[in-house]
């Protein structure tokens, strides 16, 4: 199943528990892409262990001690490959990017690669950068019980041996689709995560990174008062590294938007955009800033921000959607239509894209094309079981349109 070429060997290391629903998708994405699969199960009661074994994994077991770093480190200690790749069950490899990245692993000075992870759930920063691919060495280990990182180990090793290089890979390598609020609540994950982060931060209040993670979780959960406290505490910790400061400002902007303070939210996004992080990392701020400007009637600024979003991530449907909305708002209908059509080439299963396209086509008098797009939107919503299908039909009927 796994690769056997005379190149650097890669061990995929995972920790899992009751992931029978998600694990097959993850394992399908790594089929023939890694040389060894280590799966540490922390107490599953479903078919997770069987699924891992059927995929050819070396299956390990441990009791859960409420410490992700301890479990991660136990898994990677069992690996025999030259490199460690870390994935969760709700993630998958983006094959084209991974293939290119893997070809770089034979570089003798390469210590680790930080990779972009694409977030598919609304409310998350669209892209995050993580150290998920690193050499298999006993002095590279995870730290922190929650939102665990190997970064401190990597930096310490690099300081001791300056010849080592840590490379920021420019394109997304991992897609993450499992942090939806419904899923978090269904599994009780959000409350456990909150408790663990609060316990850690009570002893380590200077940890701006985990202040950001806890604040972002609380914004998602709707506890805005507590979220504001942690996010502002994170900003007070000297000057956090740019990626952490960006996320602190980003989540504060989301919070202030939900509080109705548009001016403050705009200021936060503008401050976030000043941070020296990857252009693609700024996608969320540009998109949300475009929507805020459009809500305030500042249509030119909304359009400019949307163009910046597309420049940052040309293949991101969220950026193209923002451009479609902004272009339509200023009367640039051809560009709006082109943006939605390009987005549909990237994601032909998103009914909202058909709906938006149908609205612009209707506005410019291309009625048959408009009706076809609306039919696609309704069919897509129905396939998802979304009530938006009926709502769209009723709105169209109110306009005298019967499809």
From Swiss-Prot:
Any Pfam family matching the protein: TPR_11
Residues of the signal peptide: none
InterPro entries referenced in this protein's UniProt entry, alphabetically: Glyco_trans_2-like (IPR001173), Nucleotide-diphossugar_trans (IPR029044), TPR-like_helical_dom_sf (IPR011990), TPR_rpt (IPR019734)
SMART domains to which the protein is assigned, alphabetical: TPR
Keyword Repeat carried by entry: yes
Lineage top rank: taxon: Bacteria
TPR repeat placement: 208-243, 244-282, 283-316, 317-350, 351-387
CDD domains hit by this protein: Beta4Glucosyltransferase
Keyword annotations: Repeat, TPR repeat
Name of the protein in question: TPR repeat-containing protein Synpcc7942_0270
Annotated source species: Synechococcus elongatus (strain ATCC 33912 / PCC 7942 / FACHB-805) (Anacystis nidulans R2)
